[in-house]
């Protein structure tokens, strides 16, 4: 089910409850010229978003929660592509999070064209992320400042707010001390 929010619709997620167990571990990464595949250890379920955010402390990052099968997610990525090169030159990191609902083969085919860091969460990590953050559907976005604080979040609303909203937020975050 898709709903219209902030111009672009989002794809609804099923609400599930997964017991949370806090654990602190670091991500591992495989890097290429234009993208990096990162993973969280399978044991990390609770606070998976916070674990990912820690990897970007000291940088401004746009976090995009999406899926390969989600047309609004793919349309939003196309929109972001027009502002991404300029923002990357300014040091903005682009972080893409999906789960096992995105078929591995499809995801592997898509990510080389999506410049940034990519996480493919386990089924349990994905369900916990959706529940902990109150994410009703995808895509959803979060901008984090260099100090790790939140500059923008629509995790509980969904939909891409548009480049006219996201770009100024990212630029302001880059300038922030």
Predicted regions and their residues:
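N-terminal targeting signals for export/organelle localization
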Residues: 1-42, 176-177
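Alpha-helical subdomain
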Residues: 53-55, 109-113, 117, 151-155, ...
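Short pre-active-site segment immediately N-terminal to redox-active cysteine/selenocysteine motifs
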Residues: 59-61, 65-69, 103, 137
């Amino acid at each position: 089910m898709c709903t219209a929010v902030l111009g672009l619709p989002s794809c609804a997620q099923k609400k599930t409850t997964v017991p949370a167990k806090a654990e602190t571990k670091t991500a591992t990464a495989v890097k290429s010229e234009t993208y990096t595949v990162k993973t969280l250890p399978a044991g990390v379920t609770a606070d998976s978003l916070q674990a990912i955010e820690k990897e970007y402390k000291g940088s401004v990052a746009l976090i995009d929660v999406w899926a390969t099968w989600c047309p609004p997610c793919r349309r939003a990525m196309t929109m972001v592509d027009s502002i991404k090169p300029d923002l990357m030159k300014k040091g903005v990191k682009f972080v893409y999070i999906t789960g096992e609902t995105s078929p591995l083969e499809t995801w592997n085919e898509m990510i080389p064209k999506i410049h940034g860091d990519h996480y493919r969460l386990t089924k349990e990590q994905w369900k916990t992320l959706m529940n902990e953050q109150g994410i009703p559907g995808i895509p959803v976005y979060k901008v984090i400042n260099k100090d790790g604080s939140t500059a923008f979040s629509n995790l509980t609303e969904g939909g891409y707010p548009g480049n006219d909203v996201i770009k100024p937020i990212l630029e302001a975050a880059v300038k922030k001390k």
